[in-house]
A protein has these predicted regions:
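A structural micro-motif
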Residues: 4, 37, 105, 153-154
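N-terminal subdomain of lithium-sensitive/metallo-dependent phosphomonoesterases centered on the IMPase/IPPase/PAP
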Residues: 1-60
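Generic detector of well-ordered alpha-helical packing
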Residues: 20, 24, 43, 59-62, ...
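DPxDG-like acidic metal-binding loop motif
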Residues: 49-108
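An extended, acidic
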Residues: 115-187
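Short, solvent-exposed loop/turn motifs
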Residues: 85, 113-115
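Residue-level signal for inorganic ion chemistry
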Residues: 19, 30, 63, 92, ...
Length: 187
């Protein structure tokens, strides 16, 4: 896949050939697995539906990271029944890791059970942050957030892949993740 086949969806928000082709192939495969399910995907396939089952797909979370060959970037797939999430799977490409969970069950990384950290004090918390592409609208919130955390949290990182960072929280690598204005495919 050519990292240079890229379009700009909006200012600083990119879509690559890989996003589109990954989405096409995932939808094709999932359609055979559960034909009655609808789809909502980041690159525009499908929309929120009233169908009983709906796949929620981000075919390449962390597109900017992918374009620049920087980890992490991943594929994220969830299945919902109306508004209730039933399962989620995230494949983090750079680390070759597969995170998954089923509602009412445990969370796993490559078949091994994972847990969130037991850190409960902000001073010790290692926190992932995310900011949306529309930076002008979010600028006051982002500035306030960074100001509040700087010097109070044990550390912060901006990694560029919401799905991967949330999995890292589930595995105890991060203690929390903070971001507003996410799409349904990001979580």
């Amino acid at each position: 896949f050519d990292r240079n086949l890229v379009e700009e969806k909006s200012a600083h928000n990119y879509v690559s050939y890989v996003d589109k082709e990954s989405e096409r192939q995932i939808i094709e495969a999932l359609s055979t697995l559960l034909p009655e399910a609808g789809f909502i995907a980041e690159e525009g396939s499908g929309s929120l539906t009233d169908e009983e089952y709906c796949w929620v797909i981000d075919p390449l979370d962390g597109t900017s990271n992918y374009i620049h060959d920087i980890a992490p970037y991943c594929v994220s797939i969830a299945l919902r029944n109306r508004k209730e999430l039933l399962l989620g799977v995230v494949y983090e490409v750079c680390r070759d890791e597969c995170f998954y969970a089923v509602k009412g069950g445990k969370a796993y990384l490559d078949g091994n059970e994972i847990h969130v950290s037991d850190v409960s004090v902000l001073d010790n918390a290692f926190i992932a942050l995310g900011f949306p592409y529309n930076s002008d609208a979010y600028r006051p919130v982002a500035a306030h957030l960074v100001d509040r955390l700087y010097g109070f949290a044990g550390g912060t990182r901006l990694m560029g892949s919401a799905a991967a960072e949330l999995c890292y929280v589930a595995a105890g690598r991060f203690d929390a993740r903070i971001e507003a204005y996410l799409g349904p495919w990001d979580v």
